[in-house]
Every structure is written in C-alpha cells, then in structure tokens.
Amino acid sequence: MRSCQHRYGDCFRAEFGAGRHFYFLSDPKVIEQVLTANPANFDSGRANWILRPTVGDNSLLLLDGDRHQRHRQLLMPPFHGERMKAYGELICRLTEQVASQWPLNQPFATRPEIQKISLSIILQAVFGLTEGPRCDRLRSLMDALLKLTTSRFGFVMAFFPILQRDYGAWSPGRRFNQVMHQIDEELYAEIRERRHAFDPTRSDILTLLLAARDETGQPMTDVELRDELMTLLLAGHETTATAITWAIYWIHYLPAVKAKLLTELASLEKQPDLGAIVRLPYLNAICYETLRIYPIALITLPRILKVPMEIGGYQFEPESLLAPCIYLVHQRPDLYPEPTTFRPERFLERQFSPYEYFPFGGSNRRCIGAAFALYEMKLVLATLLTRYELTLAETKPVVPIRRGVTTAPKGGVKLIAKGQHSAVSTPIASLCQT
C-alpha cells in the first residue's frame, strides 16, 4: 500500500473484477470532500457485501438511507454518555478477574487474554450476560468464528463465496457454516426468551432493540435483531482487544512512556472516579497514538459512487469504490513527523482534523462504538498498569500482521507477570473488587 502511494501518489486505483475500480485515497483534503459529501451519493452498505455471511442483510454495516439512519440512532445511545459510563466498574472488575489468573514469571500471549475481557464486556453490554451456559457457549463460539474468519484462508474465503460452501468434513466452509448455525441458535433462543418475558427495566442493548418500533409501529423482526446483535458482537470486541494489545506493547517496549504513564496514574486520588482516569492527558495520548501508528482497520468502510463526481481534481464514475486510507494518512510525515516512531506527545502538542486522524472512520459511517472503545482502552490499561508488574518477554520489535480485516501484533505480544502491586498503593484498586 505504501509502495503504491510512493509510486502513484495520494490517489491510486486497484481493479476488483467486472470493470469496477477501487480507489485508495490518502490526501486529507480529498478525504474531507468524500466524508462531507451528500451520503445519498453513495451506496456504502452495498460496498460491504463481504460481511454479509456473518452479519446478515439487516446489519447496520450493510444498510443505507433512512433505514441506516434509523438503526444508527437506535444503537448509538448505549455507547455514549451515562449509559456507557455505567459499564466502567464492570470493565475494571472483568480486567482484574482475567488478569488475576495469569501465570507468574512465565511468558503468555497477551492478545487472547485481552480478548476474553473485551468479549465479556460486549456480552454484558449487548445481552446483560455475565455468566451462565449461554454466555459460556457464545464465548466459545465467537472464539471459534474469529479463528476461522481471521486466518489467511478465512480472509480469502470472505471474498469468494464459493469457498464458503460445504465441501465435506474437512472443508473450512463446513466448519464456518456449523459455527454460524450454532451462534444463530443461541441468538434466536435469547431473542425468543427475552421477547416472551420482556423486562423494560433492563438496560442492555437487546432490551432497547426489542422495545423499538418503526414509523408504522412495527417492532424489529427476529432476523433484524439477530443481524444487529451479531454485528455488535463481532465489531465490539475483537478490534478493541487488538488496540489494547498494541497499547500494552508500546507502553512496555518504551520505558520512558511507561514511566510517564505510571507517574500520571500515581497522581490520582486513592479512590478516583472513573471520569478522572479517562481524562488523564497522557493516557489519552497513548491511546490516540496507538490507533495512529497501527490503526485497526487500514481503510474506512468503502463507498460505492451512485453518480459521477469530481473530487480534488479527480473524476470518478458511478460504481467506483472510494476508500479513504486511514493507515496512509496516519503515516504522512507532513502531518506526523517521524511517523513510524511511537510518540504520544504529538497529541498533546496539537489537534488533528477528522480528515487527518480518523481511526474509527468518518461521516455517517463512523463507528458507533468509538467512544466506548476508547473508554474501555483507558480503563483496561489503567487497571493493569496500577495493579500488575508486567514486562515484555521478548525485547525484539513486534511487527504487524493482517488478522482478517484488522492489523494485529504478530505473536499476540508475549508478557511476563512479575506480581501484583500492593492494593493500598493503587489508586483504582477499589474499582476492581468483585
């Protein structure tokens, strides 16, 4: 991708069959024109067809127009404001529960452990589930699905539906369909039970969706509910776990960064409120820089043009796919001097426009869980750094690898837990008690 930019400039084209052109954009001014253009000029949902086998036709990611806007407004509230903050203590407790089981003085892969935390958090947010047989089954099935879809073959399988078919006992297509069928059974069973015994006092997302009515007074169908729940389960934990793992790596790879963060955390009161933690400037800067240097998604969700359009001096024809490239913009030396260097201070020195820094996409397709993901990142990092003495098991640099549509650290980042800090000396210890 970077070599193409160096060779062809800030707008280059790839061919994706049937005469369709896929344009990668990395000029912030051009990206601003795309993200501020009338959304009606694009088929953004149709551009995400490779997600259909997992999230279904009724997913927010595949919708356009009024229906997309209606679903977006419905799903936004739980991930913002007071509803989001209500999950703060849960995040700290779940982090402590998982980390307390880590082996002492022997290496372990961090990423799978952080994914346990993120999946538990999203199961609570979406279903209100923290334990029980269904919760355990969903954890196991989601783990199996991610192993299938984030493998190299799984990435190829997403682009070629013929590979998703069942060709026998050893075919990946059979295993994929089996796992999806089992997940669907769990989701539909939960929907039926909750619809039958509806409890409006519950605050989870499924309750909100069950109570929702469209302009004609009709509730969402079971299939619509299933597709939105599946979208939230997939998008709501794997990406966040990857971002947190990258942050843990950088903090422990660079001693000066870790020392500065620990000093900032130590400045908190003995029993701070969660708002004080998430407002810490250097902690914020670490999270922002983590999402800059290796953004979880390399591009925004692409947009298919419905009409001819001239943008930034370029003429684009209908059916062209436009993809603002997050990674290439975040690596521009004119915006970020020494872009391959992890330096959180750059976010304390200046502000960047939403077309210069956009790890969660932009416009009406911006990730609805962006605020929640950052909230979770900060609280997980603060809990781990104040509760545990951790070191990297290996000093060599960790390189990024493609994990499905995300960019993850190769090897999952090996850590060694040396022990726990004294609970008396840790400022957020009281939030981690079960």
Label every PLM stretch briefly.
Residues 1-70, 85-97, 117, 129-134, ...:
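N-terminal membrane-proximal hinge/A-helix region immediately C-terminal to the signal-anchor transmembrane segment
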Residues 5, 95, 143-147, 266-268, ...:
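Cytochrome P450 proximal C-terminal region
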Residues 88-92, 139-145, 200-207, 250-297, ...:
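Cytochrome P450 I-helix active-site segment
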Residues 168-175, 283-299, 303, 410-434:
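C-terminal domain-closing interface element
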Residues 239-264, 371-387:
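Cytochrome P450 catalytic-core helices
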Residues 306, 324-350, 431-432:
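Conserved cytochrome P450 K-helix/beta-meander segment immediately N-terminal to the heme-binding cysteine loop
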